[in-house]
From Swiss-Prot:
<feature type="binding site">
    <location>
        <position position="111"/>
    </location>
    <ligand>
        <name>S-adenosyl-L-methionine</name>
    </ligand>
</feature>
<keyword id="KW-0808">Transferase</keyword>
<dbReference type="InterPro" id="IPR023397">
    <property type="entry name" value="SAM-dep_MeTrfase_MraW_recog"/>
</dbReference>
<feature type="binding site">
    <location>
        <position position="84"/>
    </location>
    <ligand>
        <name>S-adenosyl-L-methionine</name>
    </ligand>
</feature>
<dbReference type="GO" id="GO:0070475">
    <property type="term" value="P:rRNA base methylation"/>
</dbReference>
<keyword id="KW-0949">S-adenosyl-L-methionine</keyword>
<dbReference type="InterPro" id="IPR029063">
    <property type="entry name" value="SAM-dependent_MTases_sf"/>
</dbReference>
<keyword id="KW-0489">Methyltransferase</keyword>
<feature type="binding site">
    <location>
        <position position="55"/>
    </location>
    <ligand>
        <name>S-adenosyl-L-methionine</name>
    </ligand>
</feature>
<comment type="function">
    <text>Specifically methylates the N4 position of cytidine in position 1402 (C1402) of 16S rRNA.</text>
</comment>
<dbReference type="GO" id="GO:0005737">
    <property type="term" value="C:cytoplasm"/>
</dbReference>
<feature type="binding site">
    <location>
        <position position="104"/>
    </location>
    <ligand>
        <name>S-adenosyl-L-methionine</name>
    </ligand>
</feature>
<protein>
    <recommendedName>
        <fullName>Ribosomal RNA small subunit methyltransferase H</fullName>
        <ecNumber>2.1.1.199</ecNumber>
    </recommendedName>
</protein>
<feature type="binding site">
    <location>
        <begin position="35"/>
        <end position="37"/>
    </location>
    <ligand>
        <name>S-adenosyl-L-methionine</name>
    </ligand>
</feature>
<keyword id="KW-0963">Cytoplasm</keyword>
<keyword id="KW-0698">rRNA processing</keyword>
<dbReference type="GO" id="GO:0071424">
    <property type="term" value="F:rRNA (cytosine-N4-)-methyltransferase activity"/>
</dbReference>
Amino acid sequence: MTETFQHYTVMLKETVDGLNIKPDGIYVDCTLGGAGHSEYLLSQLNTNGHLYAFDQDQKAIDHAKVRLAPYIEKGMVTFIKANFRELEAKIKEHVPQVDGILYDLGVSSPQLDEAERGFSYHQDAPLDMRMDQSAPLSAYDVVNEYSYNELVKIFFRYGEEKFSKQIAREIERVRKIHPIQTTGELVEIIKDVIPAPARRKGGHPAKRIFQAIRIAVNDELGAEEASLEQAIRLLKINGRISVITFHSLEDRIVKSMFKEYSTVQDLPPGLPVVPEEFQPELKLINRKPILPSEEELSENNRSRSAKLRIAEKIRVKEE
Protein backbone atom coordinates (compact mmCIF):
# COMPACT_ATOMS: atom_id res chain seq x y z
CA MET A 1 0.00 0.00 0.00
CA THR A 2 2.71 2.49 0.97
CA GLU A 3 4.65 1.78 -2.23
CA THR A 4 1.69 2.82 -4.36
CA PHE A 5 0.90 5.91 -2.30
CA GLN A 6 3.97 8.15 -2.43
CA HIS A 7 3.03 11.82 -2.42
CA TYR A 8 5.37 14.82 -2.22
CA THR A 9 3.90 17.21 0.33
CA VAL A 10 3.80 20.72 -1.11
CA MET A 11 4.95 23.63 1.11
CA LEU A 12 4.81 21.37 4.16
CA LYS A 13 6.19 23.67 6.86
CA GLU A 14 4.80 26.91 5.44
CA THR A 15 1.25 25.50 5.41
CA VAL A 16 1.26 23.89 8.85
CA ASP A 17 3.39 26.50 10.65
CA GLY A 18 1.09 29.14 9.16
CA LEU A 19 -1.71 27.72 11.32
CA ASN A 20 0.16 28.90 14.44
CA ILE A 21 -0.25 25.46 16.04
CA LYS A 22 -1.30 25.18 19.69
CA PRO A 23 -0.10 21.86 21.19
CA ASP A 24 -3.52 21.06 22.65
CA GLY A 25 -5.51 22.45 19.71
CA ILE A 26 -8.10 20.83 17.45
CA TYR A 27 -7.26 20.84 13.75
CA VAL A 28 -8.72 19.66 10.45
CA ASP A 29 -6.86 18.44 7.36
CA CYS A 30 -9.52 18.66 4.66
CA THR A 31 -7.31 16.92 2.10
CA LEU A 32 -5.51 14.01 3.78
CA GLY A 33 -3.92 12.67 0.57
CA GLY A 34 -0.49 11.22 1.32
CA ALA A 35 -0.81 12.40 4.98
CA GLY A 36 2.35 14.54 4.86
CA HIS A 37 0.69 17.68 6.23
CA SER A 38 -1.23 15.59 8.78
CA GLU A 39 1.91 13.83 10.03
CA TYR A 40 3.82 17.08 10.48
CA LEU A 41 0.83 18.77 12.15
CA LEU A 42 0.38 15.84 14.58
CA SER A 43 4.07 16.06 15.50
CA GLN A 44 3.36 19.58 16.84
CA LEU A 45 0.50 18.41 19.12
CA ASN A 46 0.49 16.86 22.57
CA THR A 47 -1.91 14.05 23.49
CA ASN A 48 -4.64 16.59 24.30
CA GLY A 49 -4.56 17.84 20.71
CA HIS A 50 -6.59 16.21 17.95
CA LEU A 51 -6.70 16.04 14.16
CA TYR A 52 -9.75 15.32 11.99
CA ALA A 53 -8.66 14.17 8.53
CA PHE A 54 -10.94 14.15 5.47
CA ASP A 55 -10.54 12.20 2.25
CA GLN A 56 -12.97 10.74 -0.28
CA ASP A 57 -10.41 8.16 -1.34
CA GLN A 58 -10.37 4.97 0.75
CA LYS A 59 -6.84 4.18 -0.50
CA ALA A 60 -5.58 7.45 0.97
CA ILE A 61 -7.18 6.67 4.34
CA ASP A 62 -5.81 3.10 4.36
CA HIS A 63 -2.32 4.41 3.65
CA ALA A 64 -2.62 7.13 6.31
CA LYS A 65 -3.62 4.55 8.93
CA VAL A 66 -0.17 2.99 8.45
CA ARG A 67 1.77 6.26 8.28
CA LEU A 68 -0.01 7.83 11.27
CA ALA A 69 -0.20 4.65 13.39
CA PRO A 70 1.74 6.09 16.39
CA TYR A 71 -0.76 8.97 16.68
CA ILE A 72 -3.77 6.72 16.13
CA GLU A 73 -2.61 4.58 19.07
CA LYS A 74 -2.68 7.72 21.23
CA GLY A 75 -6.23 8.54 20.10
CA MET A 76 -5.14 11.77 18.37
CA VAL A 77 -6.64 11.18 14.90
CA THR A 78 -10.16 10.75 13.51
CA PHE A 79 -10.54 9.84 9.82
CA ILE A 80 -13.62 11.03 7.96
CA LYS A 81 -14.33 9.47 4.54
CA ALA A 82 -16.31 12.28 2.95
CA ASN A 83 -16.10 15.18 0.54
CA PHE A 84 -14.93 18.30 2.36
CA ARG A 85 -18.14 20.05 1.25
CA GLU A 86 -19.59 18.15 4.26
CA LEU A 87 -17.01 19.73 6.58
CA GLU A 88 -19.32 21.53 9.00
CA ALA A 89 -21.83 18.73 9.47
CA LYS A 90 -19.13 16.07 9.96
CA ILE A 91 -17.01 18.12 12.37
CA LYS A 92 -20.00 19.17 14.47
CA GLU A 93 -20.68 15.48 15.13
CA HIS A 94 -17.48 15.67 17.24
CA VAL A 95 -16.71 19.27 18.29
CA PRO A 96 -18.40 22.69 17.90
CA GLN A 97 -15.31 24.61 16.71
CA VAL A 98 -11.66 24.11 15.75
CA ASP A 99 -8.33 25.96 15.99
CA GLY A 100 -7.14 25.52 12.43
CA ILE A 101 -8.05 24.08 9.04
CA LEU A 102 -5.85 23.30 6.04
CA TYR A 103 -6.51 22.48 2.39
CA ASP A 104 -4.11 21.15 -0.24
CA LEU A 105 -6.30 21.31 -3.33
CA GLY A 106 -3.94 19.48 -5.69
CA VAL A 107 -4.75 15.99 -6.94
CA SER A 108 -2.42 13.74 -4.94
CA SER A 109 0.48 12.25 -6.89
CA PRO A 110 -0.70 8.64 -6.45
CA GLN A 111 -4.03 9.50 -8.07
CA LEU A 112 -2.12 11.04 -10.96
CA ASP A 113 0.33 8.16 -11.17
CA GLU A 114 -2.10 5.24 -10.93
CA ALA A 115 -3.01 4.71 -14.55
CA GLU A 116 -6.36 3.08 -13.81
CA ARG A 117 -7.68 6.23 -12.11
CA GLY A 118 -7.68 8.06 -15.46
CA PHE A 119 -6.33 11.41 -14.18
CA SER A 120 -3.17 11.37 -16.27
CA TYR A 121 -2.80 12.32 -19.91
CA HIS A 122 0.60 10.57 -19.95
CA GLN A 123 -0.81 7.05 -19.50
CA ASP A 124 -3.60 5.22 -21.31
CA ALA A 125 -6.43 4.21 -18.97
CA PRO A 126 -10.23 4.05 -18.76
CA LEU A 127 -11.82 7.52 -18.58
CA ASP A 128 -12.62 7.80 -14.85
CA MET A 129 -11.19 10.78 -12.86
CA ARG A 130 -13.42 10.21 -9.82
CA MET A 131 -11.82 11.17 -6.50
CA ASP A 132 -14.54 9.13 -4.81
CA GLN A 133 -14.64 5.78 -6.59
CA SER A 134 -18.27 5.24 -5.57
CA ALA A 135 -19.47 8.52 -7.16
CA PRO A 136 -21.91 8.06 -10.05
CA LEU A 137 -20.43 10.53 -12.58
CA SER A 138 -17.17 9.65 -14.35
CA ALA A 139 -15.10 11.26 -17.10
CA TYR A 140 -16.53 8.66 -19.50
CA ASP A 141 -20.03 10.04 -18.85
CA VAL A 142 -18.93 13.64 -19.41
CA VAL A 143 -17.06 12.89 -22.64
CA ASN A 144 -19.67 10.59 -24.15
CA GLU A 145 -22.96 12.02 -22.87
CA TYR A 146 -22.62 15.77 -22.36
CA SER A 147 -23.90 17.90 -25.24
CA TYR A 148 -21.61 19.93 -27.47
CA ASN A 149 -22.65 23.14 -25.66
CA GLU A 150 -22.07 21.61 -22.22
CA LEU A 151 -18.60 20.44 -23.26
CA VAL A 152 -17.69 23.86 -24.65
CA LYS A 153 -18.80 25.51 -21.41
CA ILE A 154 -16.81 23.09 -19.24
CA PHE A 155 -13.66 23.30 -21.38
CA PHE A 156 -13.75 27.10 -21.52
CA ARG A 157 -14.81 27.78 -17.93
CA TYR A 158 -12.76 25.15 -16.10
CA GLY A 159 -9.87 24.68 -18.52
CA GLU A 160 -9.62 28.17 -20.02
CA GLU A 161 -9.01 26.33 -23.31
CA LYS A 162 -9.15 28.57 -26.37
CA PHE A 163 -9.81 25.63 -28.71
CA SER A 164 -12.84 24.51 -26.66
CA LYS A 165 -15.30 24.59 -29.56
CA GLN A 166 -13.07 22.70 -31.96
CA ILE A 167 -12.28 19.99 -29.38
CA ALA A 168 -15.94 19.60 -28.38
CA ARG A 169 -16.92 19.33 -32.05
CA GLU A 170 -14.35 16.59 -32.70
CA ILE A 171 -15.45 14.67 -29.57
CA GLU A 172 -19.01 14.87 -30.83
CA ARG A 173 -17.95 13.55 -34.26
CA VAL A 174 -15.88 10.63 -32.92
CA ARG A 175 -18.41 9.43 -30.33
CA LYS A 176 -21.07 9.10 -33.05
CA ILE A 177 -18.84 6.41 -34.55
CA HIS A 178 -17.85 4.70 -31.27
CA PRO A 179 -17.71 5.57 -27.54
CA ILE A 180 -14.53 7.30 -26.38
CA GLN A 181 -13.34 4.92 -23.68
CA THR A 182 -9.77 5.76 -22.71
CA THR A 183 -7.56 8.70 -21.81
CA GLY A 184 -5.31 7.80 -24.75
CA GLU A 185 -8.18 8.14 -27.22
CA LEU A 186 -9.12 11.52 -25.76
CA VAL A 187 -5.51 12.76 -25.91
CA GLU A 188 -5.30 11.83 -29.61
CA ILE A 189 -8.56 13.69 -30.35
CA ILE A 190 -7.20 16.81 -28.62
CA LYS A 191 -3.85 16.58 -30.41
CA ASP A 192 -5.59 16.22 -33.77
CA VAL A 193 -7.57 19.42 -33.20
CA ILE A 194 -5.01 21.80 -31.68
CA PRO A 195 -2.82 23.42 -34.37
CA ALA A 196 0.85 22.40 -34.34
CA PRO A 197 2.20 25.87 -33.31
CA ALA A 198 -0.13 25.90 -30.26
CA ARG A 199 0.83 22.32 -29.37
CA ARG A 200 4.48 23.29 -29.14
CA LYS A 201 3.97 25.79 -26.32
CA GLY A 202 2.12 25.92 -23.00
CA GLY A 203 2.75 22.38 -21.79
CA HIS A 204 0.92 19.21 -22.77
CA PRO A 205 -1.92 19.93 -25.22
CA ALA A 206 -4.38 17.84 -23.18
CA LYS A 207 -3.58 19.49 -19.82
CA ARG A 208 -6.38 22.06 -19.81
CA ILE A 209 -9.07 19.67 -21.07
CA PHE A 210 -8.17 17.01 -18.49
CA GLN A 211 -8.26 19.66 -15.75
CA ALA A 212 -11.67 20.84 -16.95
CA ILE A 213 -13.17 17.33 -17.03
CA ARG A 214 -11.71 16.49 -13.60
CA ILE A 215 -13.19 19.65 -12.08
CA ALA A 216 -16.60 18.87 -13.63
CA VAL A 217 -16.61 15.21 -12.56
CA ASN A 218 -15.79 16.07 -8.94
CA ASP A 219 -17.53 19.49 -8.77
CA GLU A 220 -14.24 20.72 -7.33
CA LEU A 221 -14.91 24.46 -7.45
CA GLY A 222 -18.40 24.12 -5.99
CA ALA A 223 -17.04 21.95 -3.20
CA GLU A 224 -14.16 24.36 -2.55
CA GLU A 225 -16.45 27.38 -2.24
CA ALA A 226 -18.98 25.62 0.00
CA SER A 227 -16.27 24.17 2.23
CA LEU A 228 -14.37 27.44 2.71
CA GLU A 229 -17.57 29.18 3.84
CA GLN A 230 -18.08 26.42 6.41
CA ALA A 231 -14.43 26.51 7.48
CA ILE A 232 -14.63 30.20 8.36
CA ARG A 233 -17.71 29.52 10.51
CA LEU A 234 -16.02 26.59 12.27
CA LEU A 235 -12.89 28.50 13.31
CA LYS A 236 -12.50 29.75 16.86
CA ILE A 237 -11.31 33.31 17.38
CA ASN A 238 -7.58 33.43 16.45
CA GLY A 239 -8.00 30.17 14.56
CA ARG A 240 -6.36 30.04 11.15
CA ILE A 241 -7.00 28.57 7.71
CA SER A 242 -4.26 27.61 5.21
CA VAL A 243 -5.15 26.88 1.58
CA ILE A 244 -2.83 25.63 -1.17
CA THR A 245 -4.18 26.02 -4.72
CA PHE A 246 -2.74 24.83 -8.02
CA HIS A 247 -4.53 26.80 -10.72
CA SER A 248 -6.03 30.23 -11.20
CA LEU A 249 -9.66 29.11 -10.83
CA GLU A 250 -9.03 27.62 -7.38
CA ASP A 251 -6.90 30.56 -6.28
CA ARG A 252 -9.47 33.10 -7.45
CA ILE A 253 -12.09 31.55 -5.14
CA VAL A 254 -9.77 31.67 -2.11
CA LYS A 255 -8.52 35.17 -2.89
CA SER A 256 -12.00 36.64 -3.38
CA MET A 257 -13.49 34.90 -0.34
CA PHE A 258 -10.63 35.94 1.94
CA LYS A 259 -10.93 39.49 0.59
CA GLU A 260 -14.70 39.54 1.19
CA TYR A 261 -14.35 38.32 4.78
CA SER A 262 -11.36 40.58 5.62
CA THR A 263 -12.78 43.85 4.26
CA VAL A 264 -14.49 46.41 6.50
CA GLN A 265 -18.16 46.72 5.53
CA ASP A 266 -19.63 49.99 4.24
CA LEU A 267 -19.68 52.38 7.18
CA PRO A 268 -21.96 55.28 8.00
CA PRO A 269 -19.99 58.50 7.27
CA GLY A 270 -18.20 60.42 10.01
CA LEU A 271 -17.44 57.58 12.47
CA PRO A 272 -14.12 58.11 14.33
CA VAL A 273 -13.58 54.36 14.86
CA VAL A 274 -14.95 51.24 13.21
CA PRO A 275 -17.73 49.79 15.43
CA GLU A 276 -17.40 46.13 16.44
CA GLU A 277 -20.35 45.03 14.29
CA PHE A 278 -18.63 46.41 11.18
CA GLN A 279 -15.27 44.75 11.83
CA PRO A 280 -14.32 42.01 9.35
CA GLU A 281 -14.31 38.33 10.36
CA LEU A 282 -10.87 37.55 8.94
CA LYS A 283 -7.41 39.06 8.93
CA LEU A 284 -5.09 38.18 6.04
CA ILE A 285 -1.78 36.74 7.27
CA ASN A 286 -0.19 37.17 3.84
CA ARG A 287 -1.46 39.79 1.39
CA LYS A 288 0.22 38.06 -1.52
CA PRO A 289 0.30 34.28 -1.89
CA ILE A 290 3.29 32.38 -0.52
CA LEU A 291 5.12 30.49 -3.29
CA PRO A 292 7.32 27.38 -3.09
CA SER A 293 11.02 27.90 -2.39
CA GLU A 294 13.65 27.36 -5.09
CA GLU A 295 14.81 24.30 -3.14
CA GLU A 296 11.32 22.78 -3.20
CA LEU A 297 10.90 23.51 -6.90
CA SER A 298 14.16 21.68 -7.63
CA GLU A 299 12.87 18.63 -5.71
CA ASN A 300 9.29 18.59 -6.97
CA ASN A 301 8.27 19.99 -10.32
CA ARG A 302 4.56 19.64 -9.43
CA SER A 303 4.97 22.43 -6.84
CA ARG A 304 5.62 25.05 -9.54
CA SER A 305 2.01 26.29 -9.78
CA ALA A 306 1.24 26.11 -6.03
CA LYS A 307 0.09 29.18 -4.09
CA LEU A 308 -0.54 29.34 -0.33
CA ARG A 309 -2.92 31.80 1.31
CA ILE A 310 -3.47 32.07 5.08
CA ALA A 311 -6.11 33.97 7.07
CA GLU A 312 -6.99 34.31 10.77
CA LYS A 313 -10.45 34.60 12.34
CA ILE A 314 -10.70 37.80 14.37
CA ARG A 315 -14.45 38.15 14.91
CA VAL A 316 -17.55 35.98 15.07
CA LYS A 317 -20.26 37.27 12.77
CA GLU A 318 -23.57 37.92 14.49
CA GLU A 319 -26.36 35.81 12.99
